[in-house]
């Protein structure tokens, strides 16, 4: 009784939501079929027939998949059979990776022996699990395909190397605020031949400067499709990996120090099939953009706070990347990208569907060209633009026939411009106006009355937001996509105090309240109307 009860309680204490705190647990052992338990009991009295016994295990597991995490836990306590099925049908685990997790790892993975997606997250103020615990996990999860490590600072190169040798089928690795370095990363690349997605943030073990050990390419280079590097002091050491990933489709570089022009030139010469590039707060100039223009299949480009990029670089991209569908530019109010670059985009990129301009000052000249040539333009966001007033909004209303979603923020438009939308943009379904102080609620009400099917969101009194980055918006979209994908994976479920969807929804609301960026609220609200700004949406 006591042993089994402590087993269930200890395991559930460690299985948690990413922001929950766990309690320390003692040594436990997994429940066995012949053990009595006060937590797991057979609810059917003697002489009663258990009609669920005729339902195959696979059907019971399928039913469990449609339940929330809490309901699954409660169902697992109905009887020993359901307890066993619920554990075996779990494919996703999120664990509090504090050091005391090591003692219960055998019990956890004895019950949950079908896990393919694992998240290990530790609080920054706590001591994380070390190499021995990671090796135990790799021995219990040989079929692991996805691993997320957060703030696991006690894991070294040796632990990652042992893990990579045991979990050779890994397809996705995401690590942040960890202490291992190039040796551990190379071990993953040398052993995981199926690796498709790699995301690295603040990897502390990478040596800065000329002595940095190069990373990659390894056998994983042949399968890699997505590489994302964030806040690395010496991200250029990943150059051999990026250049060697011939099948790379998506490259995201966020706030990585160093000059990236030369590396982008080498990448463009060797990796020509890239379709999506994100550059945020990066030291890159028109030289780097000119290099990217060699990627003729480029469809999605985000330039966020790259002040050395000018019209010259954007023109080069537009002239050679004619398949461009989504363009996000945060000009940081430097006025180095203006009508000249946008007119070139309008001239050479007829497939453009989504345009986001932050801190850029387009005029009617470029907007008319975009409306006339980009007939598939469905989503337009203009934020912090001093030149977008009523004439420009009237131009958009009259000429952007395909436009479905429009966001105007911190622009000098008034009620007159809103009235133009009443008779323009016949396909418009969503309008969002924020911090445009000349627009009144009466104008918004008139627009709602005139076009009953149009969703109008007016917020003129929101406090100023200091930052204007689109990266958080992208992260929220990717998170939404991951939740949709997870719901389609057989038997997948997060073991948490609350489900993942609830967690991400809370994070989204929190990000909106605190005003972390200028565009996050726009896309988050737009997505609720059935549209997605996801960079992966085709």
Predicted segments — roles?
Residues 45, 57, 61, 70, ...:
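Innate immune receptor modules and recognition interfaces
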Residues 69, 99-105, 124-132, 153-158, ...:
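Short, solvent-exposed loop/turn at the beta-strand->alpha-helix junction
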Residues 85-91, 110-117, 139-146, 165-172, ...:
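Leucine-rich repeat
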Residues 375, 379-452:
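Ankyrin-repeat and related helical/solenoid repeat scaffolds used for protein-protein interactions
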Residues 407, 426-513:
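Leucine-rich repeat domain C-terminal region
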Residues 120, 149, 175, 200, ...:
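LRR/LRR-like solenoid scaffold signature
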Residues 1-164, 169-226, 236-243, 250, ...:
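N-terminal adaptor-interaction module of cullin-RING ubiquitin ligase components
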Residues 1-54, 470-472, 477-538:
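CRL adaptor-proximal regions
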């Amino acid at each position: 009784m006591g042993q089994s009860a402590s087993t269930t309680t200890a395991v559930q204490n460690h299985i948690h939501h990413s922001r929950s705190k766990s309690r320390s647990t003692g040594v436990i052992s997994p429940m066995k079929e012949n053990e009595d338990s006060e937590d797991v009991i057979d609810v059917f009295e003697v002489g009663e027939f258990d009609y669920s016994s005729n339902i195959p295990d696979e059907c019971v597991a399928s039913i469990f998949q449609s339940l929330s995490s809490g309901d699954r836990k409660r169902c697992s306590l109905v009887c020993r059979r359901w307890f066993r099925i619920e554990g075996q049908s779990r494919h996703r685990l999120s664990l509090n990776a504090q050091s005391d997790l090591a003692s219960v790892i055998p019990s956890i993975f004895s019950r949950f022996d079908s896990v393919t997606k694992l998240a290990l997250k530790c609080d920054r103020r706590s001591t994380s699990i070390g190499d021995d615990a990671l090796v135990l996990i790799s021995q219990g999860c040989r079929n692991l395909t996805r691993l997320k490590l957060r703030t696991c600072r006690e894991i070294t190169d040796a632990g990652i190397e042992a893990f990579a040798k045991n979990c050779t089928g890994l397809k996705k690795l995401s690590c942040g605020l960890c202490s291992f370095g190039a040796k551990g990363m190379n071990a993953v690349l040398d052993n995981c031949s199926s690796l498709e997605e790699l995301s690295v943030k603040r990897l502390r073990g990478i040596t800065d400067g000329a002595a940095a050990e190069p990373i990659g390419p390894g056998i994983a280079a042949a399968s890699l499709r997505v590489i994302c590097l964030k806040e690395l002091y010496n991200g250029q050491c990943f150059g051999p990996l990026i250049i060697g990933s011939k099948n790379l489709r998506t490259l995201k570089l966020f706030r990585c120090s160093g000059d990236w022009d030369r590396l982008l030139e080498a990448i463009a010469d060797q990796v020509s099939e890239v379709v999506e590039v994100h550059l945020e707060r990066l030291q890159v100039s028109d030289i780097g953009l000119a290099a990217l223009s060699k990627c003729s299949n480029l469809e999605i480009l985000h330039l966020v706070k790259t002040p050395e990029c000018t019209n010259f670089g954007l023109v080069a991209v537009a002239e050679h990347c004619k398949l461009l569908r989504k363009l996000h530019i945060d000009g940081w109010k430097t006025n180095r990208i203006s009508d000249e670059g946008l007119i070139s985009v309008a001239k050479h990129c007829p497939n453009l569907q989504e345009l986001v301009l932050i801190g850029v000052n387009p005029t009617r000249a470029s907007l008319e060209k975009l409306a006339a040539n980009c007939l598939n333009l469905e989503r337009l966001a203009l934020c912090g633009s001093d030149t977008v007033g009523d004439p420009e909004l009237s131009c958009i209303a009259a000429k952007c026939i395909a436009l479905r979603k429009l966001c105007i923020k911190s622009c000098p438009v008034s009620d007159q411009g809103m009235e133009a939308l009443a008779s323009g943009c016949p396909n418009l379904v969503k309008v969002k106006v924020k911090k445009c102080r000349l627009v009144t609620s009466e104008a918004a009400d008139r627009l709602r009355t005139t076009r009953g099917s149009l969703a109008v969101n007016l917020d003129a009194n929101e406090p100023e937001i200091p930052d204007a980055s689109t990266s958080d918006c992208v992260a929220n979209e990717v998170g939404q996509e991951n939740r949709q994908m997870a719901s389609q994976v057989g038997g997948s479920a997060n073991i948490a105090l609350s489900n993942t969807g609830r967690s991400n929804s809370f994070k989204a609301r929190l990000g909106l309240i605190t005003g972390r960026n200028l565009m996050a609220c726009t896309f988050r609200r737009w997505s609720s109307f059935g549209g997605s700004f996801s960079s992966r949406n085709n």
